[in-house]
Amino acid sequence: MTSDKTLNNLIAYLDNPHPTVEQAIEVFTPLTVGDYDDVHIAALLATIRTRGETYADIAGAAKAFLAAGRPFPITGAGLMDSAGTGGDGANTINVTTAASLVAAAGGVKMVKCGNRSVSSKSGSADVLEALNIPLDLNPDRAVRQFNASNFTFLFAPAYNPAVAHVQPVRKALKVPTLFNTLGPILAPARPEFQVMGVANPKLGQIIAEVFRELGRSHALVVHGSGTDEIAVHGPTTVWELRDGEISTYTITPEEIGINRYELSELAGGDGVENAHLMRETFASRGPAAHRDAISATAGAMFYTANHVPTIAEGVAKAQTMLADGSVERWLAIHEEANYAE
């Protein structure tokens, strides 16, 4: 049962259009331990959706849920995570997941947190499972996988179990909520580097500020012409956090060394189909649009991890790796590996 103090804090928060991070932490912490009734959770999520997500909402909720979560055994310096908010309705191939594998094959320390499909036909877990990348490993085996390959995948529910308290209400509301934004931010590895796509460009600056609050040293938040990816069909807005400073700029496909394509050329299917398309790209047989879209995001990852001085040079590195078979060989080594010992 919700205590009077907790309920009074919640009511005050709902009436406050400009909450502080500390107030948000105070309101979201009871949510992490199941202290709210469903009606209270619905009121909180609906109010935030109606007035618009603020920096305090996102930063405070992130801090509350990270404090309640289970960190990955390896955290911090040198690690990267990558994900998007989803919700752009594009149903493309799994660009970010494919780019994460390219980045790992190229030396980026990638600890990717994700889940099965929610708003698309194929979530990151769906396509990785179809690629025979071992999933749902216990932490010790996941560490062995990471040490062997520069890559591991962490199921979000296993590391952020407190989110389960919200799921029934999220499903009942049937609209995007704060937790669509929070998902990629609640990275169990507490990474130093992050690339995150947002379907709603109004959130770009806010999320960059949240990453600064959470201690990221270098992060990119991107919105590409209506999608939560770096676009091959138009310009992409980038909010870049580097050493505490945030800059905003626009990049075009031509500026980073790729061609333009129609968004429809990136249309994807379910996990099995997208895995097949990914293998074709890794083997240099896939459509040029797929190669360039994956290279654009992988290039941003190489740049964010400070492996190259510009995104364009990162794109060139990714394209070279796809052309010479480096990624295909990496996948052949690491798919179906056991990591039991």
From Swiss-Prot:
Mg(2+) 1 binds at residues 96, 229. One of its GO terms (molecular function) is anthranilate phosphoribosyltransferase activity. Pathway: Amino-acid biosynthesis; L-tryptophan biosynthesis; L-tryptophan from chorismate: step 2/5. Its cofactor is Mg(2+). It comes from the Bacteria. GO terms for cellular component: cytosol. Keywords: Amino-acid biosynthesis, Aromatic amino acid biosynthesis, Glycosyltransferase, Magnesium, Metal-binding, Transferase, Tryptophan biosynthesis. Anthranilate 2 binds at residue 170. Its EC number is 2.4.2.18. It catalyses: N-(5-phospho-beta-D-ribosyl)anthranilate + diphosphate = 5-phospho-alpha-D-ribose 1-diphosphate + anthranilate. 5-phospho-alpha-D-ribose 1-diphosphate binds at residues 84, 87-88, 92, 94-97, 112-120, 124. Belongs to the anthranilate phosphoribosyltransferase family. Homodimer. This is Anthranilate phosphoribosyltransferase. It comes from Corynebacterium diphtheriae (strain ATCC 700971 / NCTC 13129 / Biotype gravis).
